Amino acid sequence: MTLGFMGVFAAVISERVSARAGWWLLGPFLIWGVVSVEVWRRTELAGAGDLRMYALVQFYPMLAIPLILWLFPPRYTASHRVWQMILWYMAAKILEAADVPIHQLFGQQMSGHALKHLAAAMALWMPLCMLAEREPTSK
């Protein structure tokens, strides 16, 4: 999920702010995502479980993307797919937070964690739909 959403964050910057900036930021964003997971893993092994960097990677783009969409006009149609992506991502986070109650609700047959991955897959499907549907906006 982390790598997918960091890539989408760079793509939104590329589409709305600057193509050059989006491409330039893609590598650092992907590295940031990997490092955040590795910091979490290492601190978890040390008994501390520091999720601060991981949380920043998970939530900052989902706060920044709506701001970018609001401040910078679209160059292509089908921007509604980015909003749909954000909604699916929010659903994934809610399902993750409700892991245990969902697991109990489904009689230990399905967990919120598993459903989170389905919602995250839907979220990452939305930019692909956008690319298939979009056309340049008229100025």
How would you label these PLM feature ranges?
Residues 1-109, 116-139:
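Multi-pass alpha-helical transmembrane bundles in non-GPCR membrane proteins
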